[in-house]
Amino acid sequence: MNNYTTINVKNRTAINVKNKDMKMNVTAKWVFTFLFVAAASMLHAGAYTNPVLPYDYSDPDVCQAGEDYYMTSSSFNCIPGLQILHSRDLVHWRFVDAALRWRVPGTEQAASDSPEYGCGVWAPSIRFHKGRFYIYYGDPDRGVYCVRSQATSGAVEAFPLEWEEAVLVKPGKGFIDACPLWDEDGRVYLVHALAGSRAGLKSVLMVCELTADGLACKTESRIVFDGHPDHPTSEGPKFYKRNGYYYIMHPAGGVATGWQVCQRSRSPYGPYETKVVLAQGKTGVNGPHQGAWVGYWFLHFQDVGVAGRIVHLQPLRWQDDWPVMGNEGEPVSQGNVPDKAVSTIGENANPRLFREEFSTTDLPLSWQWSGNYDARYGFCNAAQSMLRLFSYPCDSIPASPSLLLQKIPANRAFTVTAKVRFTPLKKITGHERAGLIVAGRQSYMLDAPANGEWTWLRVTVSQNHDCQFYTSTDGKTYIAVGKPFRAVEGVWIGAKVGLYCTRDRVKINDSGYMDVDWFEIR
């Protein structure tokens, strides 16, 4: 994350665009609401098209509580982490919570230090057990953690929940991709994988027994499956039990090109029979694997490069006590789900238009900071319906924990626009910067003018992720700035777009700031 390019206002070409200066009035909001509801009604006749979530939700897992489904996914270094999405039909998803609100557990460095890109929260599993939600995940540098909710009914109306402090269940480097199983006899098991970069071994799956509360190891882990040589990079296991069989479902073969494997045994420690249950075959869906079995469905991701890992839904049936996924083991492009009322609780996780006007005191859950949270990053000034970001010290903009970012949509072109006003601190003129960022392994920034005046910053992104920055002084005429560039994915995640307000590490007792009137992805 050390590579970056800053675009200043040079080599400009003017174009005229529709004026988006004004905040949406009540009538406009009703129009957008009507259009969204109408579109949802037309699409929600039980049919769906994959991907059901064309955004980066890496390593998704799902559990069921009553008639409600809950999803979480890898959040790595981003905060809030372990975002929780809700659905009634596995197709329409909305944000309802995040289990890690402030920091990645175990990170001892100050929030002002650089984020640990690609580290932190890997491949979580979520379960609802005896009135509590449990989320287990592996941190490749620290071990397996469990985050547990306070007692709850499981109904979506109870969200957001109170979450206990994360517990380090299994300390040690290289333990990743953990999933629990509560057996009928009260015993609790944990399956996990190994990160080769830390453990010096990969492609094996391990099982240990946990204490009754699921918060500590009762036994040492032992290998129950070796993926060498037929199933290399076996990881991301999920643990289930059905008809007396213990099942471990996991991906193998690599993120972009692998397949889904199912293991079954009469004992949690094996020996296990092995079968490939989902693969690309003759379809265009590469690497259809790593996800969740729930009811008659299997959710998994597809790595699409710059936009990250997007979520697909496959039908699932059972034959001879083996799962049959998709269309005889190949992913489907369309399907049908039971027609259920779409929940309106929470923020839509798959909007065609995303527009944030910062009219409340809390940021919506779709926003994530690039590192551990610090209140000095900024705040939502609901009284004036705007966001204020303070300049935060860092070594470089991509290395700042204070980047405020959004996932990008896959498989379509889109435009990002923000109306901003950058007011630097005169005492440190030239040491502060603020603006619009396209973040990834290579990051690109468009600096806002340091004049305390409102300006419009824009980036257009093609379906192939070719980008062009623009600026405007009136929201009507936009001027191309700099050369076109291509967005680049991040470390284990897709590229993101968002905002920055940073400064060099100079000694000062105050800060400049950038106000954001609104931010839009369309």
Cite the ranges covered by each PLM segment.
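Short, linear, compositionally biased motifs with a strong N-terminal bias
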Residues: 18-19, 37
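Bacterial N-terminal signal peptides
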Residues: 30-41
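Hydrophobic residues within membrane-embedded alpha helices
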Residues: 7-8, 54
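Bacterial N-terminal signal peptides that target proteins for export
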Residues: 22-32
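Carbohydrate-active catalytic/glycan-binding domains of CAZyme proteins
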Residues: 2, 45-522
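Intrinsic-disorder-associated, low-complexity terminal segments enriched in Asp/Asn/His/Tyr and depleted
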Residues: 2-4, 11, 19-21
